[in-house]
Each structure stands twice: as structure tokens, then as C-alpha cells.
Amino acid sequence: ANDRKVVSILGAQGGPKLTLPTTTTPIDPATGQPSVTEPAIPVDLTAKNFLITGTDNGACIDPDSPYAAAFGNRNGLGERADTLMILRLDPKTNAAAVLSFPRDLWVRINGKKTQGRINSAFNRDDPNPLIVTIFDNFGILIDHYVNIDFCAFKEIVDAVGGVRVPFATPVKDKNTNLLIEQAGCHTFDGEEGLAYVRSRHFRYYDAKTKKWIEDPAADRGRISRQQDFLRRAIQKALDKSAGNPTIAKDLIDAALQYVILDANLTPGKLLELASAMKNLDTSTMKTYQVEGTGKMVGELSVIEPRLKTDNMKAVLAVFQGRARLLDAPEQIFELVTTTVAPTTTIATATTVQPSTVVGQAAPPTTKAPRATTTTSTTSTTLVPVYVESNSVGILPTNDPACR
């Protein structure tokens, strides 16, 4: 696309070097068959980290849309980082995982001693302060950068023909004007999808009590739904472009009208990546969140990262390139993981029982004996983990037919 916007990012110097040279035969767009005249193109199968930021601007919202009141008027607010996540892709094994960063994480900013909320390091057109912040606090190197604003989100969702999400009950959020009145498989278009992934006061209808119940996991529940939506959107794109490089190119061209990428993430590399990851089963994609404990810093309610638990160390090792993506553990959420100051009521994973929460993972139980896990990529023995859950909050049901 002629309007493609690119930025320069810091190189991942000293990062994991796992390049496994191979080749693939180019596809002739005219016939859809392997080309017999062009030489094979080298494909980089190194596992890579993609920093994905979502920004909340008011552009591209139809003023006649039922969601315009919730998103359309953002004059004077600028663009803020509403979503921060790292997508790690391993083309060699067709594996993927996502690590999300709550925007209120209290961290050192841009390699300095000064602390602030992690989203204060965000600059849409210069991701390097955020990249430095992530490395300085979490030891994770970034290979590529993707910024998705409202326009890009709408374009991507609409380009794949909408994203289907299954619900066991009606759901709503009056703040974003989201209202799904019927249980079942619902297809989101771009604008309605925005209302869903941005929902912070997500409610579901309890038929027994005949009441609307709000997700007690608050912002972490929203993050879990964003991760689930991303997984479904990727699967929809893979399904739509399966075996057809022309459709894959069309989808990429549609997205590139609005997204901002690092200069090295060219359309050609995106097509190469799409081809290499075509067999990805997104139902196996692991999803994680940086854990933390709520606290007050002056008048600010922030989250102090909690990185020293065995489980969080094992999760970070995957994104640091010290453990194989295929060996990624499940995430064990500790009891106190909240954006609310300790002086207020804290909503934890045990606040609401699974019998009353649609799609919520069972609350942590007493710990079972742990087994040692060893990764083949290094000689280091990873800290042991025990599988309990890898998401929190009100989530869609697991319906493989809804995709």
C-alpha cells in the first residue's frame, strides 16, 4: 500500500540466534502454483517477538454508528497505548504465544531510574522508549513493531470477513454500547469488535438470578478477551487465505493502509511469515499476562510487577528466547493480581465461583507436586510449573465450530 507507515527500531543485539536456513518455492500469483522459473527464496525460521500496541484514536468511527458516542469524540486526548502485548511466533514449529502488559504496570521508564506506568513510555511513531523499557524491566528483546489504531483494527476485522466469538449467555457493556442479546456464535464486524475488546465493564446475564453480573477480573478480564479475540482473528485470516497467496496478499495490503510497522517488516516478509505459519493451530496458542500487585504511588493506583515466582520466571524465559515456545508452561495466577489499590476491595480469581461465571477458569487450588521441566534449547533446567489456568475473567466458551 502506498500509505504504509514505517518506523525504525533498535536492533535486537545480543538476542537469541536460532536461525535455521531453509528455502521455499515462490508461488506464481497468476496460477496459484509453485513457480518453476524463479529461484527459491530463503526463509528465516527464527522465533521472533512482535511488539503489538493498540492505540485509541477517534478516527474512522462512523458518526452514525451506535458506538460513536463511546469512541468517536477524542479531541484533545491524543493517542494512548490502550493495549500492549508481545506476540512470539516460531515458524519452525508453527507455535505461538502472547504476553500482555497491563498498562498500569509500575516500571523503570526508558532505561532510566525514573518510574512510571508502562504506557507512559509509548510513542506511536517512536517505539524505542517502550522497547527499551520492556527490555530493561523484563529482559525481553523486540524483533518487530506493529501499531494498530482504531482504523487498522476495523480494516483488519472487516477484511477477514468478521471475527466469530461464541457466548454462553447474553453480554453487554453500557460504556461501549456493546450488546449481544442472544447466546451462541456471534460475528463481530470492525466497529462492534472495538466495543468488545475495549470493554472494561463487561457483564453477562445470569438466567438463574435474572441479573447482569460484571466481570470481577476488571482490566485483566479485558486483556484475556483481547488475547482470545486476537487468536480468533489470526485463525480467521489463516482460514480465509489457506492455499491462496493472492488472498493473503490482499489481507496484508488492507491492513497496511493504517498500521505502523518497523522498517524491516516489509509486505514481502509478512507474506513469507504468513506462508511459514500457515499450519498454526491457534487453539494451542498460549496466553499470558505479566502479574503484579496493586498499590498506591501518591494518588496513582498502579501495579507492582511480580516477576520472581517460579511460574512467571518460566513464562518470561520463553519470550526471552531461553526456552522453546513448544515448552511454554501454563500460567498460574497468584491470588492477588489486581489493578485496584490495596485499600479497596480486591477482586481476585476466587471472588466468584466457576458455577456463576461463564467461561472462567477454576480458581487456584492447593498446589500439587511439581515436576521438573527441561528445555532442549539450553542446558538450563527451567523452574518447574504446575498447570492450573492461563486466563482470568469472563471469557467466551470453547466452541471449535465457531470460527
Name each model feature, range by range.
Residues A1-T93:
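Entry/capping segment at the start of metal-dependent catalytic domains
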Residues R88-P91, W106, N110, N123, ...:
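Sec-exported extracytoplasmic/periplasmic mature domains
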Residues E155-T246:
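Flexible, polar/acidic helix-loop-strand segments at domain edges
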Residues I118-Q182, N264-L270, L280:
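Amphipathic, coiled-coil-like alpha-helical scaffolding segments used for oligomerization/assembly
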Residues G72-N75, Q115-R124, G139-H144, A183, ...:
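Second-shell loop/turn segments in exported
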Residues L45-K48, E79-L84, T93-F101, K113-Q115, ...:
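Extracytoplasmic
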Residues L77-A81, K112, S120-P129, N147-C151, ...:
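Soluble non-cytosolic domains of exported or imported proteins
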Residues D62, T114, Y258-P364, L382-R403:
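C-terminal solvent-exposed extensions
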